[in-house]
Curated annotation (Swiss-Prot):
Protein's UniProt name: Glycogen synthase
Species this protein is from: Shigella flexneri serotype 5b (strain 8401)
Domain of life from the UniProt record: Bacteria
Pathway info: Glycan biosynthesis; glycogen biosynthesis
Keywords, alphabetical: Glycogen biosynthesis, Glycosyltransferase, Transferase
Length: 477
């Protein structure tokens, strides 16, 4: 079984979001599971530099100009690169310029990505041809459409990492991207009078996956579907929509081997976690005290992530004696709010604006509770890292958060399945009730330790996801 992942970023070469983490880990897990998985990426500068052994496979003149297809390896995974400097050799973000305006030729840049993905199934590399083209998010959404236009030389899977990003372009670009005008149709890639790369993936793929079972259900509902609910409800009825949970890359995220921690630990040596907490308290300007629960946030600061609720609930958290350490950037209003809280509550609130991968490990290793109060969350990786590190997740019941964290209710504690704290409604009062439950559990150290050990024993490895995808691919054949 030969599978080509078509996508726009891959950790650690280039990362703007969780998609990169998936592509950085899933193909390697699939190879270990017996699937010949490779990855197709645009040759953005950071990616091109990282694949040092790239060799020329093919040269083509395309609707988007001349391209060279390269093939090399990264961390044992075969990587195809679309080398088109006029499209991809730009500094900074792969999607927008330094003023945060989307590149005006994005329609060509990402249509080309889908086109090359489909061409791979038609023999662009004469020595390797995929049985399944697995496209990810809107950037790769045209790959299933180009496959459909070619009579489907391979099966296709389209994975929705976040339905909010739709890749919308003016209709006249149909003249530029070498797809039949008949595809510009409500039963096709047309959406509200425009081309939607996302809808192309949803409509033309043989199967759609979302990054958690709950998110797969949620995106059939109007409040989560961004206008795609009719199509997604139809795919659900046809059995062509399912959810596969993302995993944790245990080579990078494991408290037992994490060199970024002051003190490494396992579920059997949880007392060694305390050193990480005191080091984190020092680094964040908090009072060093192992008796108070340290809550943490590692997130983009947006209302989607529910960080306004944290700001609103913060006085209640601090009144009960807790501390907050926050690492993140985003909405200027939220940034200012958290910085003001740090100034108002010195020693209790520590804030670092920005994102530093290394420091996020130190927070995960040192905090007691990781807050993930998202309004929606397709899968979420932060809560999985929390479980792995014995840093109990406090989450809202949505998307992948609902699938991965079990509340410390009396029933769940008795049944041995409790792993964190879960609240229902997206408001500060509901969040504060969950925070209160965290304080109650914290007051019983042996029970807290029991839940930590339970959380750390859960298996969210990529091997589980790789097996689910392999079974899906074989069902499509």
């Amino acid at each position: 079984m030969q599978v080509l992942h078509v996508c726009s970023e891959m950790f650690p070469l280039l990362k703007t979001g969780g998609l990169a983490d998936v592509i950085g880990a899933l193909p390697a897990a699939q190879i270990a599971d017996g699937v010949d998985a490779r990855v197709l990426l645009p040759a953005f500068p950071d990616i091109r530099r990282g694949v040092t052994d790239a060799q020329v496979v093919s040269r083509r003149d395309t609707f988007a100009g001349h391209i060279t297809l390269l093939f090399g390896h990264y961390n044992g995974v075969g990587i195809y690169l679309i080398d088109a400097p006029h499209l991809y050799d730009r500094p900074g973000s792969p999607y927008h310029d330094t003023n945060l305006f989307a590149y005006t030729d994005n329609v060509l840049r990402f249509a080309l990505l889908g086109w090359v993905g489909a061409e791979m199934a038609s023999g662009l590399d004469p020595f390797w041809r995929p049985d399944v083209v697995h496209a990810h998010d809107w950037h790769a959404g045209l790959a299933p459409a180009y496959l459909a236009a070619r009579g489907r030389p391979a099966k296709s899977v389209f994975t929705v990492h976040n339905l909010a990003y739709q890749g919308m372009f003016y209709a006249h670009h149909m003249n530029d991207i070498q797809l039949p005008w008949s595809f510009f149709n409500i039963h096709g890639l047309e959406f509200n009078g425009q081309i939607s790369f996302l809808k192309a993936g949803l409509y033309y793929a043989d199967h759609i996956t979302a990054v958690s079972p709950t998110y797969a259900r949620e995106i059939t509902e109007p409040q989560f579907a961004y206008g795609m609910e009719g199509l997604l409800q139809q795919r659900h009825r046809e059995g062509r929509l399912s959810g596969v949970l993302n995993g944790v890359d245990e080579k990078i995220w494991s408290p037992e081997t994490d060199l970024l921690l002051a003190s490494r630990y396992t579920r059997d040596t949880l007392e060694d976690k305390a050193e990480n907490k005191s080091q984190l308290q020092i680094a964040m300007g908090l009072k060093v005290d192992d008796k108070v629960p340290l809550f943490a946030v590692v997130s983009r600061l947006t209302s989607q992530k529910g960080l306004d609720l944290v700001l609103e609930a913060l006085p209640g958290l601090l009144e009960q004696g807790g501390q907050l350490a926050l690492l993140g950037a985003g909405d200027p209003v939220l940034q200012e709010g958290f910085l003001a809280a740090a100034a108002e509550y010195p020693g209790q609130v520590g804030v670092q604006i920005g994102y530093h991968e290394a420091f996020s490990h130190r927070i995960m290793g040192g905090a007691d509770v990781i807050l993930v109060p998202s309004r929606f969350e397709p899968c979420g990786l932060t809560q999985l890292y929390g479980l792995k590190y014995g840093t109990l997740p406090l989450v809202r019941r949505t998307g992948g958060l609902a699938d991965t964290v079990s509340d410390c209710s009396l029933e769940n504690l008795a049944d041995g399945v409790a792993s964190g704290f879960v609240f229902e409604d997206s408001n500060a009062w509901s969040l504060l009730r969950a925070i209160r439950r965290a304080f109650v559990l914290w007051s019983r150290p042996s029970l807290w330790r029991f839940v930590q050990r339970q959380a750390m024993a859960m298996d969210f490895s990529w091997q589980v996801a790789a097996k689910s995808y392999r079974e899906l691919y074989y069902r499509l054949k």
